Amino acid sequence: MNMEVDTVTRKPRILLAASGSVASIKFSNLCHCFSEWAEVKAVASKSSLNFVDKPSLPQNVTLYTDEDEWSSWNKIGDPVLHIELRRWADVMIIAPLSANTLAKIAGGLCDNLLTCIVRAWDYSKPLFVAPAMNTLMWNNPFTERHLVLLDELGITLIPPIKKKLACGDYGNGAMAEPSLIYSTVRLFWESQARKQRDGTS
């Protein structure tokens, strides 16, 4: 990862994104974890809004939705939201990553704000995903193929954990806890910043 000089001296800019999994009920908690350390902006897919508790989001975190993509653009020359967010962010984290959004990213689809950001992402910058889905969906052969494609893009997987799922089943597929997602990203960022300061790669 190539970090510009100013990214070493200022707060990191973290773009958090939620896709349509019931684990999106933890999205506000995730935003609070990161907002203590970094500048945070958030993106929520239409289906994730069934679970995201918007009133409990940190006051300093702006939440963008698909509607904002279109309402912010009126004519040629106006800023394009998914491009502006990609430019702004140092790191993107999709948590939770649903089976559907995983498949979209693996196939290169870009039919909402979240997937447009990923399609336009600069892969010299880190992108993390924390999947959340039913155990049989996680174990599905398509999921394995899709994860291989994400790995080839340079996307970092924060694996799901084994527990009793929202559907009542017990098994692997629950999103990693927000505290673990936060610590994983922060440790990565601080390691890269230290290497940058020391002049190593």
UniProtKB/Swiss-Prot annotation:
The active site is at residue 167. Expressed in roots, shoots, leaves, flowers, developing siliques and seeds. Gene3D superfamilies: Flavin prenyltransferase-like. Keywords: Coenzyme A biosynthesis, Decarboxylase, Flavoprotein, FMN, Growth regulation, Lyase, Stress response. Induction: By salt stress. The keyword Lyase applies. It catalyses: N-[(R)-4-phosphopantothenoyl]-L-cysteine + H(+) = (R)-4'-phosphopantetheine + CO2. Binds 1 FMN per subunit. Its cofactor is FMN. Belongs to the HFCD (homooligomeric flavin containing Cys decarboxylase) superfamily. Homotrimer. This is Probable phosphopantothenoylcysteine decarboxylase. The gene is HAL3B.
